[in-house]
Amino acid sequence: MPTPKERPDFFTHLQTQKPRTLPGVTHPPLKITFLGTGTSSGVPMIACDCPVCTSPDPHDNRLRSSILVESAATTLVVDTTPDFRYQMLRARVKHLDAVIFTHPHKDHVAGLDDVRAFNFFQEQEMQVYANSMTIDALMREFAYAFADKKYPGVPNLRLNPITLEPFTVGDIAVTPIQVWHLKMPVLGFRFGDFTYITDANRIDETEKAKIRGSSVMVVNALRREKHISHYTIDEAVALVHELGVPTAYFTHISHQLGLHAEVDSRLPSGLHLAYDGLVVNV
């Protein structure tokens, strides 16, 4: 598989932040692309005329949350959102080795059917990594893909159950991190020095230990007001400071958080709102 190429025309309407490369890493260099940074309804939200949803700033346009993780030899995505097809087209993804799922909520799994395009061009099954709860949901919601007699053209999926034990996808080492989305266990993941967490409002101390030492982390920051199952922006900032991670990006953002430029300008040093198309090298 070819080395990931720069995509100079990817999100050319954005003033994209220069990718950050961290010194002293021992894992394969990774390129992280934020495919989407919005909450389940996306931004703009249907039928909403608030200042964020009508903002002309492209940073305020957010597809559902997902990232693309690339090494020189392996390409994977975390979650297949309802926007997955457009996210793959927009990022010009030509090869995909695997999908890793955080949890089975629809804004994280609904686009799974569209991996069949990769089945067609790569002529092989797609490797899917998920915990047992998510696998059960996928087999129910995409039952046609797992039928004994499949209709031609349905996704060809190989389900790989994962627990909290580390595993590898190609040359990328993955450490699962269990977080809590109210009462639902959700998986975050650490890839080398990079940690990705979405849909959380609580993390046990044993799992926080897996995050410590990361150079970059991503965590959800839904809005300012308290939420039953998501961190607020203030809670997310406090978590980053508690864990001592020097650089952090906030994702899974609602239109209720406010305008990107205004919120981002008020964040402490080293902390940023992520946006669709942002690239970070670790």
Pin down the residues of each PLM region.
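Binuclear metal-dependent hydrolase catalytic cores
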Residues: 11-14, 22-197, 206, 262-281
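Binuclear metal-ion centers of metallo-dependent hydrolases, dominated by the metallo-beta-lactamase
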Residues: 204-282
